[in-house]
């Protein structure tokens, strides 16, 4: 990652004192967000947590909003069909390409990227990733 310094004409070319950059790592199993302020990197804690690593997991209950991270992971043992983990492994692949074991019911044409069938309906791997972000 690099930072680009932009200055108005006739202003100092010196870098400003308070530069800011943001980075997001959407990992297969864990995700994180970090900021760079004045040249120092800091990993931010997940919402409602002191942990900086957020499990890349989304739980889709029959009613209500999807749960993300540790709250979603707690539902994995009892409801694996509606608890989506490692959604990135399904991105950019057709159902024909998916050779690994998983607990999900998949929908869609065999030659297209699948969608997960959940209690809240069909959800694409891209939509699961968007919930994590």
Predicted regions and their residues:
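N-terminal phosphate-binding loop and flanking beta/alpha elements of the actin-like ATPase fold
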Residues: 1-55, 60-133
């Amino acid at each position: 990652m690099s930072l680009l310094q932009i200055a108005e004409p006739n202003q100092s070319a010196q870098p400003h004192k308070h530069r800011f950059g943001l980075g997001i790592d959407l990992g297969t199993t864990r995700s994180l967000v970090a900021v760079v302020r004045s040249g120092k990197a800091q990993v931010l804690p997940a919402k409602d947590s002191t942990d900086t690593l957020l499990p890349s997991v989304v739980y889709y209950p029959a009613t209500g909003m999807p749960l993300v991270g540790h709250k979603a992971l707690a539902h994995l043992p009892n409801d694996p069909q509606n608890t989506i983990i490692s959604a990135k492994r399904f991105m950019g692949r057709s159902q024909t390409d998916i050779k690994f074991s998983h607990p999900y019911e998949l929908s869609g044409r065999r030659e297209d990227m699948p969608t997960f069938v959940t209690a809240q309906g069909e959800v694409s791997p891209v939509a699961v990733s968007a919930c994590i972000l």
